[in-house]
């Protein structure tokens, strides 16, 4: 009798272990590691605020977020496999990396147009729309291949001036270098620098969206490591769906203002101004890489790629979401 009970207990315990083993992974959240350029901006906050609001958890996702100094650094983290997803990588930089054989895929648009602006110290001789720029002056961008790198190149080309391009890292570091006189012309993105403009410490030179080639094109994208994307395609589809849900919530619900204000270290009034005045929701569309033919032309002109990508290459590179 005792042996029979022992055998029954063994079967029950074994069955419980098997059930736990089988149910554990199915109920667990899938982990995605994200690298995001430029902490503190409206569009760089989406993953973190969406996770705090429980949106990604509802979609059975756990995000681990690290921040980089710009799109080039973000791109390298994805290529190396240090992270799974890169948010806000410069589109031309991604085209160049893919053309060289890097294991990277575009899984969504990130910024069609951009909120960036260019500024100088109030005592600078540089005027509106880069008037007075000389070849020995320095013009900032974050990292090689980033959206700010692309924008700086386009301004020089379309406004017909020459300056020394200088990598300055993230927005706060760039501001410090301009104010200390190390760099002549800096870039920034709201909310950074708005208080300095109001205080008369700096002057606005140009908006990136002044350029038609910027405001009508998807200048930044969300990218994934090709190997992990192929292995976990359903997880990435769920991620983009949750990311879209987070964007919708952040524009529809005023409750999103307080966490963004805390995230960026600004007042709720400034947080609302940043969202409503500088980041139209259409800028953050995920479904398309808009202006791709022109982007490829620029990639050739700026020597990111030696020649146009073939239709087969474009089909492989673009893994943008399909609407349900």
Regions found by a protein language model. Name each.
Residues 58, 132, 210-215, 280-288:
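Short, solvent-exposed loop/beta-turn-alpha elements that line the ligand-binding surface or hinge
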Residues 230-306:
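Secondary-structure end/capping motifs
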Residues 14-18, 22:
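Hydrophobic helical h-region of N-terminal Sec-dependent signal peptides
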Residues 2-14:
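Bacterial N-terminal signal peptides that target proteins for export
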Residues 92, 172-262:
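Pocket-lining segment of extracytoplasmic ligand-binding domains
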Residues 24-28:
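Sec/Tat signal peptide C-region and signal peptidase I cleavage site
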Residues 110-120, 203-229, 312-324:
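Periplasmic-binding protein-like
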Residues 29-161, 165-168, 177-180, 184-190, ...:
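Short, glycine-/small- and polar/acidic-enriched structural segments
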């Amino acid at each position: 009798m005792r042996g029979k009970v022992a055998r029954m207990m063994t079967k029950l315990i074994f069955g419980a272990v098997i059930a736990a083993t089988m149910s554990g992974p199915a109920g667990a959240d899938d982990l995605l590691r994200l690298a995001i350029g430029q902490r503190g901006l409206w569009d760089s906050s989406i993953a973190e605020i969406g996770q705090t609001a429980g949106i990604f958890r509802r979609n059975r996702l756990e995000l681990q977020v690290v921040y980089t100094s710009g799109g080039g650094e973000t791109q390298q983290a994805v290529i190396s496999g240090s992270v799974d997803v890169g948010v806000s990588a410069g589109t031309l930089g991604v085209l160049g990396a893919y053309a060289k054989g890097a294991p990277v895929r575009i899984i969504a648009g990130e910024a069609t147009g951009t909120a960036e602006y260019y500024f100088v110290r109030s005592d600078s001789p540089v005027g509106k729309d880069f008037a007075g720029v000389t070849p020995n002056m320095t013009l900032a961008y974050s990292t090689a291949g980033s959206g700010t790198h692309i924008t700086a190149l386009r301004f020089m080309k379309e406004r017909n001036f020459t300056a020394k391009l200088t990598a300055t890292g993230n927005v706060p570091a760039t501001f410090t270098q301009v104010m200390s006189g190390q760099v002549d012309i800096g870039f920034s993105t709201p909310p950074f620098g708005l208080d300095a403009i109001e205080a008369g410490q700096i002057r606005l030179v140009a908006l990136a969206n002044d350029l038609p080639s910027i405001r009508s094109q998807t200048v930044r994208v969300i990218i994934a490591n090709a190997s992990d994307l192929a292995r976990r395609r359903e997880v990435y589809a769920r991620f983009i769906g949750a990311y879209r849900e987070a964007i919708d919530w952040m524009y529809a619900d005023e409750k999103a203002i307080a966490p963004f204000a805390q995230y960026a270290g600004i007042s709720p009034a400034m947080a609302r101004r940043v969202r409503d005045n500088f980041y139209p929701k259409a800028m953050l569309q995920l479904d398309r890489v808009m202006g791709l033919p022109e982007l490829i032309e620029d990639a050739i002109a700026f020597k990111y790629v030696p020649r146009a990508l073939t239709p087969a290459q474009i089909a492989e590179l673009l893994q943008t979401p399909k609407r349900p």
